[in-house]
Amino acid sequence: MYTLVLLRHGESAWNKENRFTGWTDVDLSPQGIEEAHRAATLLHDGGYSFDLAYTSVLKRAIRTLWIVLDDLDLMYLPVHHTWRLNERHYGALQGLDKRETTEKFGKDQVQAWRRGYAVRPPALEETDPRHPRFDPRYAGLKKDDLPATESLEDTLARVVPYWNETIVPTLQDGKRILIAAHGNSIRALVKYLDGVPDDVITGLNIPTGFPLVYELDDDLHPIRHYYLGDEEEIRRATESVASQTATKK
């Protein structure tokens, strides 16, 4: 049996402000820092340790991982950073307030942009300073690899090859792996591992800062998965993610 731990970063500054974030490189909020420490405590108390870690190239995931590894006295572990674990790119929605966007475009349209499996938000123009072609961290990527917007389907298309080509071999070598990533890159991986149907994955929300443990069989098929932490706190955190576009009454 293999064990894999997935961790969505702690609350970011734009999570707190309820803005679409995507590839915008915002940092953790004070609460997000606390959530990262809580995740480390849950892992420590559960007896989990790791041999290496994977994360994105966005600081909210990187800092979450740093805090967890520091608290577990594992700062020496090899850490692999990849854009393929980045959050889904939200295109021209990035930076916009989610509730205000819902009031402008309607609940159904914004929900489709947020959760529709194959629906892409409006794309960034290539001249938009928010476009990843202007960000030096992506300087080595081919133009075709730089998204101006993404659906969850697009996100899965970049996450799964990295999983199969890079992460799976390390699991099969017996390494204990922690992946600190983002709500949608984790949703993509969960969809792939569990075979979640397209119409069901739209209702899956990943809470910030709670470790998600997968136990996998010899063929890397899930035996079971579960969150570490208090069930009521996890429920509230998950519902909070789901309600981010609720309009003010």
Curated annotation (Swiss-Prot):
Class of enzymatic activity (EC top level): isomerase
Active site annotation, chain numbering: H9, E87
BP GO terms, sorted: gluconeogenesis; glycolytic process
EC number: 5.4.2.11
Reactions it catalyzes: (2R)-2-phosphoglycerate = (2R)-3-phosphoglycerate
InterPro entries, A to Z: His_Pase_superF_clade-1, His_PPase_superfam, PG/BPGM_mutase_AS, Phosphogly_mut1
MF terms (GO), sorted A to Z: phosphoglycerate mutase activity
Residues that hold substrate according to the record: 8-15, 21-22, 60, 87-90, 98, 114-115, 183-184
Pathway where this protein functions: Carbohydrate degradation; glycolysis; pyruvate from D-glyceraldehyde 3-phosphate: step 3/5
Gene3D superfamilies the UniProt entry points to: Phosphoglycerate mutase-like (3.40.50.1240)
Keywords assigned by UniProt, alphabetized: Gluconeogenesis, Glycolysis, Isomerase
HAMAP family named among the record's database cross-references: PGAM_GpmA (MF_01039)
Similarity comment: Belongs to the phosphoglycerate mutase family. BPG-dependent PGAM subfamily.
Function: Catalyzes the interconversion of 2-phosphoglycerate and 3-phosphoglycerate.
Protein name: 2,3-bisphosphoglycerate-dependent phosphoglycerate mutase
UniProt organism field: Methanosphaerula palustris (strain ATCC BAA-1556 / DSM 19958 / E1-9c)
